[in-house]
Amino acid sequence: MNFKNKRKILSFIYRYSLRSFFLLILFNVNKSLANNCQNIGEIGTSGSCNGKLIVSRQNLLDAISDGSYTVIGPGNVSYTFAEGGTGDIYTGNINDFSSLFKGKKTFNQDIGYWDTSSATNMSEMFSNARRFNQDISNWDVSNVTKMNRMFLNARYFNQDINGWDVSNVEQINLMFRNAHRFNQSLNSWDVGNVTQMAHIFRGAKAFNGNISAWNTSNVKNFIAVFVGAKSFIQDIINWDVSSGTRMNH
C-alpha cells in the first residue's frame, strides 16, 4: 500500500469515527431530554417540559375533583392547568384523557398549551363541560383512536380544530352531539379509519361546516348523524357509504 492510499484510508476512518462520536453525543442528549420529561412530580429542566411540572392522569383527576385545577409541585408550589398561571404543567406522558372534564359545567380554562402527543383516548373529555370554549387547535391528536362524545353537550364550544390530525381515529360517535354553537369547517380531517360516527352531529343546531370531502368508506354506523342539525345544508353526495350497515334516521 502506497503512502497516498494509506492517507486516504486514515482520513476516511477519522471522518467516520468523528461522525459516529457526534451522533452518539446527539443520541445521548436526546435520550436525556426524553427521560427528563418522564419524571412525574418533578420540574422539567429541558426540552418541551422545561420549567413545567410533569404530571400524571391521576394528578389531573385529583385537581379536577377538588375543583382547584391546580397541582402542587416541589416546594409546595402551585402549578395551574391554565397557561400563564403560577406555573404550567406538562401532560406529555398521559395516554388517557377520557372523561377528564366530564360534567364540569363551568370549566373554561386555557389549556391549549397541553402536550397531547401521547394521547390515545379522548372520549367524553369535555362531555357536559358546557362553558368550555378555548383554543385547542394546536393539540397533537395524531395517536388518538377514540373521540366518542368528546364535545357532547359542550354547548359553548366553537373553536377551529380543522388542523387536527385525526387519521388514526376510529370512533367519533356523538362527538358533537348537542354542541349547539359549534360551526367550524372540518374539511381537512382525514376520517379514512373511522368506522363509527353515529349521532356525531345530532342536535348540533348551528353546524354547517364543510365535510364534503370526508372519506367515509370504512364507516359502518351512520345512525342519526344529522338528526337535529337544523342548519346543515352541505353537499355530501360523494360520501362513500358502501360499508354502512346501520343508517337509521
Task: Label each residue range with its predicted role.
Residues 1-15:
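N-terminal secretory signal peptides that target proteins for export/translocation
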Residues 4, 22-25:
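A cross-taxon signal for low-complexity, glycine/charged-rich
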Residues 15-22:
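Sec-dependent signal peptide recognition
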Residues 22, 29-249:
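Negatively charged
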